[in-house]
Amino acid sequence: MSIWKEAKDASGRIYYYNTLTKKSTWEKPKELISQEELLLRENGWKAAKTADGKVYYYNPTTRETSWTIPAFEKKVEPIAEQKHDTVSHAQVNGNRIALTAGEKQEPGRTINEEESQYANNSKLLNVRRRTKEEAEKEFITMLKENQVDSTWSFSRIISELGTRDPRYWMVDDDPLWKKEMFEKYLSNRSADQLLKEHNETSKFKEAFQKMLQNNSHIKYYTRWPTAKRLIADEPIYKHSVVNEKTKRQTFQDYIDTLIDTQKESKKKLKTQALKELREYLNGIITTSSSETFITWQQLLNHYVFDKSKRYMANRHFKVLTHEDVLNEYLKIVNTIENDLQNKLNELRLRNYTRDRIARDNFKSLLREVPIKIKANTRWSDIYPHIKSDPRFLHMLGRNGSSCLDLFLDFVDEQRMYIFAQRSIAQQTLIDQNFEWNDADSDEITKQNIEKVLENDRKFDKVDKEDISLIVDGLIKQRNEKIQQKLQNERRILEQKKHYFWLLLQRTYTKTGKPKPSTWDLASKELGESLEYKALGDEDNIRRQIFEDFKPESSAPTAESATANLTLTASKKRHLTPAVELDY
């Protein structure tokens, strides 16, 4: 067990303590030196640590630095076993050249001559060593002249000043002292320097974010309290004059950048995954042997997630959710449905054109049938003549109007023509002072009207069949008017009878007055009333109502009830079927 112990002083510097002799030393004892350290020492290198704990290696002679262990040509025996009186060192352009006692010298040349030939006059290699007290002022002056501020890290000082300023190497074996001087310099900056740094916020932000980038422990999810602990010893945080709010905002801006980068990375990954998923699903859906689409449940049970080895083998699919897969499935299905719908619309458009052509051909057929279609023509009249015609057969099963619809449209046109001619005929009869004789039969009346119309020039182009239909319409119209007139007269009479009954009720029921024993007595009593006079000469009707009237009855008579029903019924429009099937 070693008698040496490693310890640290108040400043954090490492020293070594001998438990037997009770002595301490800054130099590491030989007993504690590892093989790696021996190798470094024998080749003129030393190991040190930066402020954030990263190990680096430097050569105080050549002023070289490296983050990795340098590669040496061969291992050197431990220092204790070396024979210093047989070794001489020389540096040429930073490379070590060793001459040992075993190496052969050229005749006539001495070691001193060779050392003189390969002497290196670089200022970095020929720095006069100083004590720490002597070097402190010049070291701080070096920092000031190079405009070092709190935005610098100690590793930057090593890499930049250590390679170009000899003052950095005045004390070459104590990097902790140099870091101490750096901290002291930052603490003792002048007011002007602090004000200048305070105004250079952009410079601070750039350096602060660079420091955050170099810290591998700060992630996009790191919060400010955690970050403060991680960067507490960083000079830019510890000695910066920038307020805490600006530091925190700069940190947040950096974190926002990391978050955006993370999101963008995830977005790119997901975009790639969705693209590959689309190709994967297209291959499944479009190559399916089924006549219908693969349902979502079938897809879920056999082709995606842990149900499919092929799906699980794609590492990009790991970022996809059920919702992502469902959305892509719906997009593909909708695309296929839209394609089918477009094809169906194209087919409908072609069929629409064919349907229109078929209807036009059938209309031509209706104009060519052997029997001329009139206002009273029925479907059964023309069907035998068209049932075998291709123009009729091509109409079967078509969209839009059917053959019957087109036929009825044709008949309606003829009816409208007859209706218009009937109005002209009616005016002609008025102009000719034609008198209707109710004693004549409809047939005689028809013959008389036809003679009048045939002699009128307005009907020269109207054929006899149409004139017959026009006259039939006139006779029917007159008969309907006569029937309407009679119906109105009957309704008015029934109303008068009802009003007379109400008169009797008011006179003999509500007043309590006894009903006269005879109609003659009642006639004298009621003769001046309007209801009595309204019946005119219909004395028999008045007598019948009087005899049927009973004073104790308050309900309307049967005749009045019938009159009301007749009146109500007469106001209703008689409905007929829209299409009468006559075959």
UniProtKB/Swiss-Prot annotation:
InterPro entries: FF_domain, FF_domain_sf, Prp40-like, WW_dom, WW_dom_sf
Entry coiled-coil feature ranges: none
Phenotype when changing residue 240 to P: In PRP40-1 suppressor; affects SAR1 mRNA accumulation in U1-U4 mutant at 18 degrees Celsius
GO biological process: mRNA 5'-splice site recognition; mRNA splicing, via spliceosome
Residue ranges constituting the FF domain according to the UniProt record: 132-188, 201-257, 262-332, 354-413, 427-488, 491-552
Record-annotated WW domain positions: 1-31, 42-72
Family: Belongs to the PRPF40 family.
Function in brief: Required for pre-spliceosome formation, which is the first step of pre-mRNA splicing. This protein is associated with snRNP U1. Two commitment complexes, CC1 and CC2, have been defined in yeast. CC1 is a basal complex dependent only on the 5' splice site. CC2 is a complex of lower mobility and is dependent on a branchpoint as well as a 5' splice site region. This protein is involved in CC2 formation where it binds to the branchpoint binding protein MSL5, bridging the U1 snRNP-associated 5' splice site and the MSL5-associated branch point 3' intron splice site.
Listed name of the protein: Pre-mRNA-processing protein PRP40
Organism: Saccharomyces cerevisiae (strain ATCC 204508 / S288c) (Baker's yeast)
Gene: PRP40
